[in-house]
Amino acid sequence: MKKFGKALLALLVLLLLAAALFLYWPLTQRSVPAASNDKPVDVVLVGAGIMSITLATYLQELQPDWNIQVYERLDGVAGESSDGWNNAGTGHSAFAELNYTPELPDGSIETKRAVGIAESFEVSRQFWSHQVKEGRLSQPSDFINPTPHMSFVWGDDNIAYLHKRQQALVKNPLFYGMQYSEDPAQIKQWAPLLMEGRDPKQKVAATWMPLGTDVNFGVITRQLTAGLQRSPNFSLHLNHEVSALRQNADKSWNVTVKDLKAGTESTTHARFVFIGAGGAALKLLQMSGIPESKDYAGFPVGGQFLAFQGQDVTSRHGVKAYGMAETGSPPMSVPHLDARKLDGKPVVLFGPFALYSTKFLKHGSWWDLYSSVNHNNVGPMLEVGKDNLDLVQYLMGQARLNDADRQAELVKYFPTAKPGDWKLVTAGQRVQIIKRDPLKGPVLQFGTEIVTDKDHTLAALLGASPGASTSPPIMLDLMAKAFPDQMKAGWEARLREIVPSYGRKLNDSAALVNEIRTLTSQTLHLPYLEVPVDANAASPAAAAVPAAAKEKRNANEELQAL
């Protein structure tokens, strides 16, 4: 018995030593090649998704003499979450996403986050509009299309909530035009597939916003990249993975990259580094060793959708219809029947169904999560896990789903759907932020966050939703934090040409909303509603499409222009 006790104690000691070695193992202990360039390049961008390419586009306009190098591990740009098939949701403008407008204990509706997201999306529209005018983006219908946004609920409590939500939001000029109905016939006119085959005794309600859009961020990323490549000061390196990041005494950076085809490594000397590598950003931030990286960990969650490509479905559903997450489910589980344009063709997606994976990227490694754990973040990760058991239970339940279970969820929103009509597709990975908050302690944070070092030489973007839809304003925030001197020295004036509302708030000015939306609607060929300057104006007039929009429209687009 004593021998067994000693053996058990020895095993425990070995496990503790192994755990300590694992948690304290240095991230950058190996030797790397010396930098091949004496004069540092101005900017290195890690990852060639919508975030990095948006930042590169800004910088090329603001500082065309800067040398910009982009390193991407895949063989093309926008291969991860920026790709249309991998993006969990597009055109996020808070018109329909109910998780952005929680009901407070006093029964009122919190609209602050929804208004902020709607404001941010207007900035995105201005940025894309400018790029169309400059010729960097081509025909608007290639990447953005009018697609009404709907919220759809059932049950007395949910119906009461949705009505209060609509009443709260339409007071803001950004949400003017949002309609509410409990009439099954009206809802069927908006979205036939939601209502056909539904129990006529079931009470339902919906909101309908004609100004919604669908956006293909893969197309935007590829077209902006092609525009960047026209400059001799821009270089894109595909099949190159960053393997080391080290700061020099002068605060510049040595970025070591591996050529995945040749198997060789090289090092680039850079003044500034942006880590825009999606889910991989956390590990690269940790690799940098900056003190700010110690406050973060990540929790990966994948997603799957049911995809409909048959014309009998896609021709009859031209809206994005968002529901309400089941009680106890996390915000990422909000179901939606979503009209998209992918590979130039209409598609309808239903989901998401969560997919647990330890990968930080769709094309990543199963070791990603474990290799991101260290002595700085293991405590917060365990505490967040303890406080979010509902999320753990939800993911376990999702892992047990079969096709029959998915079909059962689908018919709640598409009652006449047949199992043979859809195929299961896997979307991209998202890594939710686990953050050490100075006031709240460790928290699981939904959304995106910019992390910069105190010297303004490195920045990283962590997190997910609303993500790509607000990439232009997110990159504006990043530049304000990372390049404060340049912003004051002239960038801000130039930015007002790219984003006319820069430095001003749209959400408290109907006149400014009208001015900006007129501009972007004409360029992007999107519906437009005149917001009455009188706050007590009557019901909205019909949404109009500017005369500049001469493209052929399908029946749904014609209807929403009325």
From Swiss-Prot:
Pathway: Carbohydrate metabolism; tricarboxylic acid cycle; oxaloacetate from (S)-malate (quinone route): step 1/1. InterPro entries: FAD/NAD-bd_sf, MQO. It holds the Pfam family Mqo. GO terms for biological process: tricarboxylic acid cycle. Its cofactor is FAD. It catalyses: (S)-malate + a quinone = a quinol + oxaloacetate. It comes from the Bacteria. Keywords: FAD, Flavoprotein, Oxidoreductase, Tricarboxylic acid cycle. Its EC number is 1.1.5.4. Disulfide bonds: none annotated. GO terms for molecular function: 2-hydroxyglutarate dehydrogenase activity; L-malate dehydrogenase (quinone) activity. Gene3D superfamilies: D-Amino Acid Oxidase, subunit A, domain 2, FAD/NAD(P)-binding domain. Belongs to the MQO family. NCBIfam families: mal_quin_oxido, PRK05257.1-1, PRK05257.1-4, PRK05257.2-1, PRK05257.3-2, PRK13339.1. This is Probable malate:quinone oxidoreductase. The gene is mqo.
